[in-house]
Each structure stands twice: as structure tokens, then as C-alpha cells.
């Protein structure tokens, strides 16, 4: 059965999305992307020269026929910077999609919610397909929907922390609050974190540091691929209710007396 994710008419076959920062080399990045089974790759516009392609570039290692390139505005601390880099990526023909980041604090890398809402509204009106990186607040998520976001990307934990999904209850409330896809972004540390996000009902998970920072990034990428598939299947299958007391799994009818 086809279980692709469709956002604004764009089909995403993989629910594991992969970032491209912190790898040892472009070659390792390409191998990890391949092992992950993803078809969505995020690229920081600030760190990739999308104008001058005469020099070695990450985009030389990513086949645009095989992967959807999702430019992101990582490292932007103002609305103006975020708008500039989003527009630059589109003008260069990379994509109409943008993973929008407006960072509010250098130490925690938490988003500037006010700036994020403003930038989302502006870019959505300009025809961008906006995927804003946000906190795990359901009210903020709802306001991003109103601002024109195509999906919301709440953090599981601070970027690069590897702490996992620290507040699954808020993520669950976001899922119940918004009528657009929810993609967990940031904080994933290992395969079980991906599985938890998918079991909660999230539509996808974006991972970077958990792969790039692993002892064996290629092996971890493959592990996360399987965790994403398993978590999604478990969500669709429907887990049993949690109970305080035991319930025998073997029937008592026909027992010898």
C-alpha cells in the first residue's frame, strides 16, 4: 500500500528527511544520504555556494533527479536574513520549498517565534512552500498554520543535543491541533527517537547530527531508515491500550483440569 506523504501536491516517498551538515566529507554525506533511503535532503543556503558552481560544492554530490533539495535558512537570526537566503535559493533555481529558521538565541538555538511568524507569512504570500522550524508549543504551531505554513517542524529537543523527544505530550497536542503535516526537527539522537516520533503520529522526522555525529554515520543512517519504517507501521497498526494490571495472552478455554 502506498504510504507516501503529500504536501502541497509534492509527493515524498520517504518519511525520514536528512540534513547535510557536520559530515567529514561530501563523499561521506552522499553515502549516508543513500543509506538512509531518504528522498529529501536539506541544505543550508548560507553554507553552500549556490551561485558559483565552478568550485566543489555539496550540490555536486546530490542528484536532483533522485532527491528533493530543501534549502534551509540555518544560521539566520533576523527576519531579513531568512528572507534573503530563501529568495536566493529560489532565484538560483534550487526550490520553491524552504525550511525556515529564524533563530532567537545563540546558546540554545531556539527559534525566534515572533520573527518566524512574520517570515512565514511573507514567504507564503510570495508563493514559497514554507516548513518553519518551531518550538513544541501548540499555540505557535496553530499560528504558523494561519500564517501560511505548509507543515510545522517542532523541535524534539535543542538542535544537535541528541536528547530525543523530550515532550511527547506537546507533540501529540500539536498533532491534534493543526491540519497540516507535523515533522519533528532537531534533538534526535538514535533510532528509537525516530521510532517514537513516528509512533506518536508525526508525518516525518528530519535528522542530521544523529547520523553525521555517529561513530559510523552510514550504519546509523540505515538504522534510522528502518526505525522510521517500523515506527510508521506501528502507528498505522495501532498500539494496544496501556493497562495497570496483567491480562493473560493465552486462552483458558480447554485447559486441563
Swiss-Prot record:
- A matching Pfam family: ThiG
Query: Where located?
Result: Cytoplasm
Q: Name one GO biological process term.
A: thiamine diphosphate biosynthetic process
**EC numbers for this chain:** 2.8.1.10
One example GO MF annotation: thiazole synthase activity
Write down the chemical reaction(s) this protein catalyses. [ThiS sulfur-carrier protein]-C-terminal-Gly-aminoethanethioate + 2-iminoacetate + 1-deoxy-D-xylulose 5-phosphate = [ThiS sulfur-carrier protein]-C-terminal Gly-Gly + 2-[(2R,5Z)-2-carboxy-4-methylthiazol-5(2H)-ylidene]ethyl phosphate + 2 H2O + H(+)
Q: Which family does it belong to?
A: Belongs to the ThiG family.
Which HAMAP family does this one have?
ThiG
Query: Among its keywords, does the record have Electron transport?
Result: no
Q: Which keywords describe this protein according to UniProt?
A: Cytoplasm, Schiff base, Thiamine biosynthesis, Transferase
On subunit structure and binding partners, the annotation says:
Homotetramer. Forms heterodimers with either ThiH or ThiS.
Q: What is this protein called?
A: Thiazole synthase
**Pathway the protein takes part in:** Cofactor biosynthesis; thiamine diphosphate biosynthesis
Report the PANTHER family cross-referenced here: THIAZOLE SYNTHASE (PTHR34266:SF2)
The positions annotated for binding 1-deoxy-D-xylulose 5-phosphate are: 160, 186-187, 208-209
The kind of enzyme this is, by top-level EC class, is transferase
Q: What does this protein do?
A: Catalyzes the rearrangement of 1-deoxy-D-xylulose 5-phosphate (DXP) to produce the thiazole phosphate moiety of thiamine. Sulfur is provided by the thiocarboxylate moiety of the carrier protein ThiS. In vitro, sulfur can be provided by H(2)S.
Question: An example Gene Ontology cellular component term from the record?
Answer: 2-iminoacetate synthase complex
Q: Identify which residues the record assigns to the active site.
A: 99
